[in-house]
Amino acid sequence: AYAEALGVDIDSLILSQPNTGEEGLQIADTLISSGAIDIVVVDSVAALVPRAEIEGEMGDAHVGLQARLMSQALRKLSGTISKTKTIAIFINQIREKVGIMFGN
């Protein structure tokens, strides 16, 4: 309803909510490789949680997993993106102070 009011063609919109970061990036890769779409938006990079982190125990250290996941995915996607001319937008967020919200 809201997207439609903004002019989004709902019938052409593909929405996916994957369980893991790997799944999400694989979906993006498949869509981009198909050449059938013009734009892919990943919102948000911070929500792309690596499988190892989801399947691990609370408190386990997973240093750099997300950074490695994104680095590998972007290396893989960049070639495909240049061939298909698909636009890929990755949305992220910046956190300057842990525990501080709303500009305080």
Swiss-Prot record:
GO terms for molecular function: ATP binding; ATP-dependent DNA damage sensor activity; single-stranded DNA binding. Its main location: cytoplasm. It is found in: Cytoplasm. It comes from Lactobacillus helveticus (Lactobacillus suntoryeus). Can catalyze the hydrolysis of ATP in the presence of single-stranded DNA, the ATP-dependent uptake of single-stranded DNA by duplex DNA, and the ATP-dependent hybridization of homologous single-stranded DNAs. It interacts with LexA causing its activation and leading to its autocatalytic cleavage. Keywords: ATP-binding, Cytoplasm, DNA damage, DNA recombination, DNA repair, DNA-binding, Nucleotide-binding, SOS response. Signal peptide: none annotated. InterPro entries: DNA_recomb/repair_RecA (IPR013765), P-loop_NTPase (IPR027417), RecA-like_N (IPR049428), RecA_ATP-bd (IPR020588). GO terms for biological process: DNA recombination; DNA repair; SOS response. This is Protein RecA. The keyword Nucleotide-binding applies. One of its GO terms (cellular component) is cytosol. PROSITE patterns: RECA_2. The gene is recA. Belongs to the RecA family.
